[in-house]
Amino acid sequence: MSHIRAGKTKPEEIVAKYLFSAGFRYRRNVKNLPGTPDIVLKKYKTVIFVNGCFWHMHEGCKYFVWPQDNAEFWRKKLFANKERDEREQIELTRLGWNVIVVWECELKKDKREATLQNLVATLRENRNESNKL
């Protein structure tokens, strides 16, 4: 498990490339923010986490299935991941960041375009809201 490295997963690359092609500029895996967000759009005061459905317990998702082997280990591990995610999102919100979570299953071919279009619309809406302040 210690050899599993974060960053530059295929789902993250899909989101990053789409955002770049839509004119957004960002930083990847910013370590000085809680949770080391996958994508940080400072101009929009927004962070994006691209979460794997298994590792982050996407409830109700067909891609999240409890492992049968070593069940107690996985239960503890995955619940700890979920609790950590919640703590980090609360802290980021407290610091004034907008937090967006994109799930791996939302980037499957049948949902990808709609998900990415909604993401861009949300970012532009957030930007417009922050300009009103």
Where are each of the predicted segments found?
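Nucleic-acid endo/exonuclease domains
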Residues: 1-101, 105-133
